[in-house]
């Protein structure tokens, strides 16, 4: 049998090529828009300061790809180049895309797309979600994912400041508001307001964890009647808005608007809108921690079983950066809008589920 011997330099080149094929880790994160700012900040923080770059195709939606090394946050990766791609689509949609290996748009790094094209596609590896997998439509079995809890995310009802007299929502009122607002519908006086003009309920689309969480927490079942505005600024029926930013803009602009938001979005329009207590309890982190305020859920991180070891390393570095007690307690990106897991004295086992004590 004739054997062909390769020169030493050829063997070396082949070995180098084999190493290069595994010389980078490419991880794509999708899901919750409510947790977007925290994820962007923490993702950037786990890269080595001296070796990191960002391709930002949309700062407002978080369509960003980071690239660099993570030798401090993930020592086992050493000098391996890591590409961490962020593309937020909503909690339920994000989990579905991870489970179904659906291609999503991500920001392309130089050389990854045709000239003049700014985005490329990837199958997402991780999804952030404001809700348990079982709350997706259709429900996703717990066995489909590795899942961990990153934080506690409260939601609040917010009204335009012109809706004077609306100082509380009971559970029954919140449910009625979901189906009876708008033209010819519920007047603000029904909620304690000072006039007979109709009140307009705005909200998120069906893929939104914010919507799912709020509906579960108030016990609403069915299809809500939601409103947005058209180009002329007039109210029109909608299936729901794709982001909290769009919803808060409606509440800010329209004197007869009310809706539900994450705390960060509510704070962004504090000059024009105010929080509405639920069942007589105003939102505060303390009221969440002790179980008095009930409109809240968990922020989850999920991935399909079988994620590669190097991607698990990146996942764990991101998770550690987000759940670090010092970060959750002291960083305003987190502690203004979210409640620290370590501070909770209560828990719940499902979205909108019974709140039980962790202390006794």
State where each predicted segment sits.
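Bacterial N-terminal signal peptides that target proteins for export
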Residues: 1-9
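Flexible loop/hinge segments at secondary-structure junctions
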Residues: 23-360
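Sec/Tat signal peptide C-region and signal peptidase I cleavage site
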Residues: 16-23
